[in-house]
């Protein structure tokens, strides 16, 4: 084994400035060494993708079932702002910090989508000295999982149109085909299209469209399936459309599930990479947090729990969306029980919630921190409703003042919640050691008594109303007669036991993206109700849903380039 493995990073902190420079300057250990030394996994149970990425054999993971589970820690955040919060960075930094203080910890993250990488968001591998690597690979094709998911999605679409072309034995109504094609790219031109043009030999023309791969139900199924059998069962349960008599048509009736599962058989094995400090990270799956549940795969999470003492994972957007779905969908369905929650906040984001413009965030404003705390306070109250202890993790920025942090600390103290400042972006795991100690204290305190927000047998309408009033601070929900009828239909058809997945803006507790802070007394309008029978949840659409994003006027792709030596510049 190379002695390079144990060398410190030296003065990389001074030499490298951007996230990309830090990642490219990092020394990576062979992933087989990380797996062996950190997780006890022999090389024979790995399928390497080069030197620094690998998939873990599902049969090996099945052999771990008798092992006790480690402790599950969720990292969530306040409502997102343009100022940024750093949820992924904190997830990675906390994982490194737990290892730094002597705990055996693993990170569990979602895979980034190509669309946002080339659009406006950039990469999603953490930041500063709290990153997962190889950063470029993770942000681009990685191990090909998303391509496999897109292929499975589009195979089903092809089988639907092929069935209609060759006589339509099932009587599928072309006007009621709900299954759309998918591509992992931001491309607004594909949102609504007309397919099968060009003559009789090309099929029956109809309105169609594309979703970005991370919005596909196949992605949600991929992340909620517990094994290959469950994956194939769920794929078969997908409802692709209806007959003229409104009878649902499932993928199993098209004999599609087997072929779709075959396309996913390698992808479903979890991916293993490493942090900058050579700690293991599972990165697997990546559903949208609005149209789906916004969490990494159940298979990866379960594997990590069998292989470590602490598993640090994250859920998309703020705690009102990501954490609620993590608890009510992922944990409920997978039998997971979290031991602690970290709510990530920044002083500057709280100031934005307090009414400060982005260009004025560097000016001290203690009053705005106090006012913006209402948003964090609501999230703390919400997480407590699930019976899980909370710590507030504050990402430090150079413009933060002592007075501003003291105000935040005092407000948290009044709620009986620990508030810990971290600078893992600048100092890696050592910079989050205090946060790690606080998380261990919460976990070992044994106060967690996890329970979902609502029981399975509660009617669908009441489930959604419970989420709206208990989590969003709304006074009620409202829907027109057609949507109310859809609630009743799903209830009568036997889907009333499924959890609700709310699709709404991530920027506010309301459906108005511009309403920051902690609004209350508003009414949540329900525009539509969609059944994801394979993923086994009901999507309540409470705002404009964008399942195929577009590129901005100046996309991130314009700044990305490839050097003659193969180095990528401008990705992150």
UniProtKB/Swiss-Prot annotation:
Keywords: ATP-binding, Ligase, Nucleotide-binding, One-carbon metabolism. HAMAP family: FTHFS. The lineage of its organism: Bacteria, Pseudomonadati, Pseudomonadota, Alphaproteobacteria, Acetobacterales. ATP binds at residues 81-88. Belongs to the formate--tetrahydrofolate ligase family. GO terms for molecular function: ATP binding; formate-tetrahydrofolate ligase activity. It comes from the Bacteria. It catalyses: (6S)-5,6,7,8-tetrahydrofolate + formate + ATP = (6R)-10-formyltetrahydrofolate + ADP + phosphate. Pathway: One-carbon metabolism; tetrahydrofolate interconversion. Its EC number is 6.3.4.3. This is Formate--tetrahydrofolate ligase. GO terms for biological process: tetrahydrofolate interconversion.
């Amino acid at each position: 084994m190379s002695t390079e493995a144990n060398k410190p990073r030296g003065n990389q902190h001074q030499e490298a400035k951007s996230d990309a420079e830090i990642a490219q300057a990092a020394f990576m250990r062979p992933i087989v060494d990380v797996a062996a030394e950190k997780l006890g996994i022999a090389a024979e149970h790995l399928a390497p993708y080069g030197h620094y990425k690998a998939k873990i054999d599902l049969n090996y993971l099945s052999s771990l079932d008798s092992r006790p589970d480690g402790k599950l820690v969720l990292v969530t955040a306040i409502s997102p702002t343009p100022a940024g919060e750093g949820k992924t960075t904190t997830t990675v930094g906390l994982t490194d910090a737990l290892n730094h203080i002597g705990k055996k910890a693993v990170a569990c993250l979602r895979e980034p989508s190509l669309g946002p990488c080339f659009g406006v968001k950039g990469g999603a591998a953490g930041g500063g000295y709290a990153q997962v690597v190889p950063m470029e690979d993770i942000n681009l094709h990685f191990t090909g999982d998303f391509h496999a998911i897109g292929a499975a999605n589009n195979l089903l679409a092809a089988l639907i149109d092929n069935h209609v072309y060759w006589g339509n034995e099932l009587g599928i109504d072309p006007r009621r085909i709900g299954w759309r094609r998918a591509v992992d790219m931001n491309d607004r031109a594909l949102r609504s299209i007309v397919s099968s043009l060009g003559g009789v030999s090309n099929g029956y023309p109809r309105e169609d469209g594309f979703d970005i791969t991370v919005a596909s139900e196949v992605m949600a199924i991929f992340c909620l399936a517990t094994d290959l059998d469950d994956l194939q069962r769920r794929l078969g349960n997908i409802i692709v459309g209806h007959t003229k008599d409104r009878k649902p048509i499932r993928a199993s009736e098209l004999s599609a599930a087997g072929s779709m599962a075959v396309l996913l058989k390698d992808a479903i094995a979890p991916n293993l990479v490493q942090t900058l400090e050579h700690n293991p990270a599972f990165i697997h799956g990546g559903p949208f947090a609005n149209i789906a549940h916004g969490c990494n795969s159940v298979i990866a999470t379960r594997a990590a729990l069998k292989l470590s003492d602490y598993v640090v994972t994250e859920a998309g957007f703020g705690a009102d969306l990501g954490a609620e779905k993590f608890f009510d969908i992922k944990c409920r369905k997978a039998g997971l029980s979290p031991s602690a929650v970290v709510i990530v906040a920044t002083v500057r984001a709280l100031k934005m919630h307090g009414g400060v413009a982005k260009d004025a965030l560097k000016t001290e404003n203690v009053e705005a921190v106090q006012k913006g705390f209402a948003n964090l306070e609501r999230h703390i109250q919400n997480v407590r409703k699930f019976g899980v202890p909370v710590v507030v993790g504050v990402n430090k920025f150079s413009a933060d003042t002592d007075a501003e942090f003291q105000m935040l600390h005092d407000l948290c103290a009044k709620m009986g919640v620990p508030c810990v400042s971290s600078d893992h972006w600048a100092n890696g795991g050592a910079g989050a050691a205090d946060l790690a100690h606080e998380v261990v204290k919460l976990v070992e305190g044994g106060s967690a008594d996890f329970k979902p927000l609502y029981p399975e047998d509660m009617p669908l309408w009441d489930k959604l109303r419970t989420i709206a009033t208990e989590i969003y601070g709304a006074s009620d929900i409202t829907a027109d007669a057609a949507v109310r009828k859809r609630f009743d239909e799903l209830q009568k058809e036997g889907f009333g036991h499924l959890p609700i997945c709310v699709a709404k803006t991530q920027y506010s507790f309301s459906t108005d993206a511009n309403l920051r802070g902690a609004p209350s007394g508003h009414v949540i309008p329900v525009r539509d109700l969609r059944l994801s029978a394979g993923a086994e949840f009901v999507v309540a659409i409470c705002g404009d849903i964008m399942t195929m994003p577009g590129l901005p006027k100046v996309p991130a792709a314009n700044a990305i380039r490839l050097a003659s030596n193969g180095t990528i510049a401008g990705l992150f």
